[in-house]
Amino acid sequence: MRRYIYLLLFVLSVCGGMVTSCSRHEVRFRIGVSQCSDDEWRHQMNNEMLREALFYDGVEVEIRTVKDDNARQAEDIRHFIEAGVDLLIVAPNEAEPITPVVEEAYDRGIPVIVVDRRILSEKYTAYVGADNYEIGKAIGRYVSNMLHGKGTVVEIAGLAGSTPAIDRHEGFMSVISACPDIRLLAKEDGAWLRSRAEERMDTLLLSLIHISEPTRP
């Protein structure tokens, strides 16, 4: 996660370099940031961006955060479009509902940086995030090794419509499906929330009695 922050700070430093000749307090470069959630690492990202912006006269950063609400995030992005921001940074909640408004910003000539989660088109300027398909494959290999290629598993995934959850599941299944003696019993949506993941797991443990335990060394 810190890699995302460092890359975004680099973007801010470049933007700040474009306006260093501005007089103090004159806003010349506006950055709009649309966050999909307000968990701890996103708070850190927001604080680092705001702190970096303080080093440059004329740079203003406005951050709007929603709690996993697609409609509200679309409204926030449209607010930034109408405000005429010079740069838009978006961490999409779910890809499909947020794609149209991000495309609208891009079509209006606003540079768009998509962070952590992708959208369903190529209408953005840059993407800062992990290779979630490879992460899913790594998890699949780990599970296969722990079970010695034989057993039953359940998957508690992230928010169903978010691209990291989609990509990680596909990467995971690309490995597991090649193991004929490993069977996926169920897949549940944990929505990136620990409490919800625990709740889903408790329900599965009550309803499923054949979840394999890894072999201990």
Model regions: which residues?
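Bacterial N-terminal signal peptides that target proteins for export
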Residues: 1-8
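C-terminal motif of bacterial Sec signal peptides marking the signal peptidase cleavage site
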Residues: 20-21
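Bacterial N-terminal signal peptides
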Residues: 8-17
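Short acidic/histidine-rich motifs immediately flanking catalytic phosphotransfer sites
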Residues: 80-87, 208-209
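Flexible loop/hinge segments that line or gate small-molecule binding clefts
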Residues: 95-134, 145, 152, 158
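Signal peptide-proximal N-terminal region
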Residues: 47-63, 177-182
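Hinge/beta->alpha junction and helix N-cap segments in small-molecule ligand-binding domains
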Residues: 34-46, 62-72, 94, 117, ...
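Residue-level detector of conserved catalytic or cofactor/ligand-binding positions
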Residues: 209-217
